[in-house]
């Protein structure tokens, strides 16, 4: 019969001998949970939209969740957008359209400049359609006399044409008159969109450019910190994505809203040097004079327009409610 120590506990001995095989106790786990590692992890989560497009033909912009309501979750910005839209409609001229051929655009605008003494504070050239004759407009038209100082110029074109126009905008003579400020981008939701560029081209390329680009240029000197009566509610993002509410037409309403929110000017002109056809109509908009071969209304009168501007004023007046809500440039501290 084997001798057995009276102090020996078989279960306790098994527990002690096997302690090195068990995991850490609760106290050790709590200590490790408090430790935070700042080293980058090798395994990280990525949204591989290129892979999604290859396998499911789903474009990256279709995965953006807040394109329908860009200010969702920001009640202050929602209130600002509503108040600003209401004020813009209140101080807008009659929707004017000037229906003329492409070859008559430059002579007509020259007549307005020389004989009617018309100037505009905001001028937008181009739309979301192909075959635009933008280069002749920029080279033949005295835009420095058509646009007031300070003033704003928006030029919309596809990726190919905007690269050609960039060479012109970098020209020394042009740079003295207009200072290129920002670039805006509009992206259609998919290839079925009427705004998808290159639909009239039959050849297929490996890489397709689907964006529309806009160069925003400024005449004169404008500072955000001191010229709040000119640059007012610049809360729109530089990237715009087509929404379900975007109506069929040559110009989405969001393109107009960017210019309306950016500047308080009431004298706005839109030049569309292209035939858009009946499938993509050019609709008039309150507060704008739209010059196009296919504009749906031809009612522009320089005399009537100047009378309405005289009653409204050349700038939208400041409103306390909007002033309290709109973002401002930070005030620099005196050193």
From Swiss-Prot:
Asked if the keyword Nucleus belongs to this entry, the reply reads yes
Bias kind Polar residues: ranges: 16-25
Task: Name the domain of life this protein comes from.
Answer: Eukaryota
Q: Which UniProt keywords apply?
A: Cytoplasm, Karyogamy, Meiosis, Nucleus
Q: What result is annotated for mutating residue 287 to D? A: Decreases interaction with VIR1
Q: Which GO terms describe its biological process?
A: karyogamy involved in conjugation with cellular fusion; meiotic cell cycle; mRNA modification; positive regulation of transcription by RNA polymerase II
Per the record, its GO cellular-component terms are:
cytoplasm; cytosol; nucleus; RNA N6-methyladenosine methyltransferase complex
Q: What's one GO MF term for it?
A: mRNA binding
> Where is the protein situated, by its record's location annotation?
Nucleus; Cytoplasm
The segment annotated Disordered runs over 1-25
Additional note from the record: Present with 1690 molecules/cell in log phase SD medium.
State what protein this is by name: Karyogamy protein KAR4
């Amino acid at each position: 019969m084997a001798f057995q120590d009276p102090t020996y506990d078989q279960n306790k001995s098994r527990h002690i001998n096997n302690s090195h095989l068990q995991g850490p106790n609760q106290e050790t786990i709590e200590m490790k949970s408090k430790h935070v590692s700042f080293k980058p992890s090798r395994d990280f989560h990525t949204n591989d939209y290129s892979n999604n497009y290859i396998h499911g033909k789903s474009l990256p912009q279709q995965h953006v969740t807040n394109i329908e309501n860009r200010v969702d979750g920001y009640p202050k910005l929602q209130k600002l957008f509503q108040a600003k839209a209401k004020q813009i409609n209140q101080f807008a001229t009659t929707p004017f359209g000037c229906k003329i051929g492409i070859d008559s655009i430059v002579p007509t605008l020259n007549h307005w400049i020389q004989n009617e003494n018309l100037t505009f504070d905001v001028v937008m050239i181009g739309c979301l359609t192909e075959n635009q004759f933008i280069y002749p407009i920029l080279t033949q038209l005295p835009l420095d006399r058509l646009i007031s100082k300070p003033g704003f110029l928006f030029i919309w074109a596809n990726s190919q044409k905007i690269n050609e126009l960039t060479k012109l905008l970098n020209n020394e003579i042009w740079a003295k008159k207009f200072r290129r400020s920002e670039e805006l981008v509009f992206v259609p939701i998919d290839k079925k969109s009427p705004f998808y560029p290159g639909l009239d081209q039959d050849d297929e390329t490996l890489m397709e450019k689907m964006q529309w680009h806009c160069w925003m240029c400024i005449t004169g000197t404008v500072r955000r910190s001191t010229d709040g009566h000119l640059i007012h509610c610049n809360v729109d993002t530089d990237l715009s994505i087509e929404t379900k509410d975007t109506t069929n037409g040559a110009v989405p309403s969001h393109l107009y809203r960017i210019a309306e929110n950016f500047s308080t000017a009431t004298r706005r002109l839109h030049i569309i040097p292209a035939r858009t056809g009946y499938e993509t109509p050019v609709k008039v908009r309150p507060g704008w004079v739209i010059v196009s071969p296919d504009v749906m209304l031809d009612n522009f009168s320089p005399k009537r327009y100047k009378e309405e501007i005289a009653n409204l004023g050349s700038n939208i007046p400041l409103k306390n409610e909007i002033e309290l809500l709109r973002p401002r440039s930070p005030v620099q501290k005196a050193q």
